[in-house]
Amino acid sequence: MTTGQDALYTNSTLALNPQTGQVEWYFQHVPGETLDLDIVYERVLIDADGEQWLFTIGKDGILWKLDRRTGAFVDLRETIYQDVFETVDQTTGRLEYRQDIRDAGVGSRVAACPSLLGGHNWQASAYHPDAGALVIPLHQACMYLTGRDVEFVEGGGGTAGRWELREMPGTNGNV
């Protein structure tokens, strides 16, 4: 898989009909994700001003806003410094990796923010309706990631990538 391939339904939000199990709609946040910056955490459902929204945030630190009735992209916000996407289309929500990430191969060392620990990770977000506040735990660190050969054997698993934490710009030495 490359960053140019979709790998359908990975890093996606899916709405399933509970009676039939059929997919009602889906939105793929990051097609071809390759840096372990997946969008796999909670979906927060918010009703406000007569609208029904779905918010989610993943390891890339991008907060997504979708129409929860249709799955249509509404908006996104970068909540922390990120430099893995050279294109962040505010109209369509389409992201494009930097060229050096798209070209990286086994043995290539890539600098990336945030790290694979994630801008957001397993600590759940929460919505406070009285305050109108969405509270999101964030992690601010960057990484160097080097791809290594992987021997595919039954029961093996893992990517075998080597990664090192590094300081995120603007964090004043705090990792």
Task: Set out the residue ranges of the language-model regions.
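Repeat-blade elements of multi-bladed beta-propeller folds
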Residues: 1-2, 12, 37-58, 121-126, ...
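Extracytoplasmic/lumenal domain signature
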Residues: 2-39, 46-51, 62-112, 142-175
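Long, low-complexity segments enriched in small/aliphatic residues
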Residues: 93, 100, 108-111, 117-143
